[in-house]
């Protein structure tokens, strides 16, 4: 059985078991609408490759992410590469800017860890949700 944090017990989310998939999820609330709360300067300062961070992406992480995507039949190349790789390139070109607090937090973690992260607005999406490796014939929106 997959790990599901206690906070998520009321959310319909399944995380399928797969040897390459190590998914985690959490729910958070923000004190105000994201459009009215700009990201703090300390967070924006993390959106560059030279920022101090407790973790660092490396080739092993990038290879593992690509291997997982290929296991589902996805070709992580060109415009379809993992978002974490796009963030690394954009930050290196000083083209990564603030969007909102939720996205900026996840982008900063993704940039420095190399792990792809998704943000889902539960006020705009409805479950059940599934995290898993795509099966033949599945289609999905990526990036």
What are these regions (language model features)?
Residues 1-143:
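Charge-biased, low-complexity intrinsically disordered regions
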């Amino acid at each position: 059985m997959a790990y599901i944090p206690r906070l998520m017990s009321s959310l319909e989310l399944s995380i399928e078991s797969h040897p390459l998939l190590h998914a985690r999820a959490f729910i958070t609330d923000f004190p105000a609408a994201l459009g009215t709360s700009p990201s703090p300067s300390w967070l924006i300062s993390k959106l560059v490759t030279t920022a101090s961070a407790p973790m660092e992406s490396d080739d092993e992480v990038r290879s593992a992410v690509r291997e997982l995507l290929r296991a589902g039949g996805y070709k992580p190349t060109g415009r379809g590469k993992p978002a974490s790789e796009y963030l690394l390139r954009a930050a290196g070109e000083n083209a990564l800017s603030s969007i909102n607090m939720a996205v900026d937090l996840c982008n900063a973690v993704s940039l420095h860890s190399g792990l792809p992260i998704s943000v889902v607005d539960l006020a705009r999406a409805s479950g059940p949700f599934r995290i898993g490796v795509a099966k033949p014939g599945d289609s999905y929106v990526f990036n």
